[in-house]
């Protein structure tokens, strides 16, 4: 019954800002045929602006850390709502085609830019995907960087005389308890930069415990749709150990012949004369 209520509430959402559902994390797309096609799908997430206000979309192929987004393919073709497919469940879809010569193989994500005339824009990102059999140039960072979560959405929308700017500043949300966040997509708490000394003498709970709320009637919207788990926001330093290796036990007097510890002498047994 609870599952049914959740499903019904999802379909009862008002038409609103972008919530990407495809591609999924780690999905692989091949450019062996000269073109790689990424199927993009998104639904309404209950936040402003309504999707019927979106004038056009722009799609870009990007890579790199969440704090250093680099878009390597940014076609300026404006995709209008008439260019999109929409099924009966309210899922929008678009096939984003990219020539395999644009970039080399590696880990990428797609940036979805939605423009609302006279009000502003929103930015959303797909989970990280893998492009294989690509024939374009590559970089060391593209080949080596990996992560599990996409960049967080950004919103800059003017409603009336106010500007509604919801840009996820990682440095600010890391310290905000999960239960105090109010956006549709929340950020899970992560480890902070450790100090150089341990000063605590007792333990204490850093964040409140979680809870679940059951509803007796169907809701027309959801308080939250997704949770992001950011990458580390701290660094771990390392150095080369230049200390001279210790001598082997046989060289520093710590080794001894085990025969000196024997209290009984050994003798050879002939197994042919052993009885069971």
Swiss-Prot record:
Residues 1-16 form the signal peptide. It holds the Pfam family Kre9_KNH1_C. Its main location: secreted. The keyword Transcription regulation does not apply. InterPro entries: Kre9/Knh1, Kre9/Knh1_C. It is found in: Secreted, Cell wall. Involved in cell wall beta(1->6) glucan synthesis. This is Cell wall synthesis protein KRE9. It comes from Candida glabrata (strain ATCC 2001 / BCRC 20586 / JCM 3761 / NBRC 0622 / NRRL Y-65 / CBS 138).
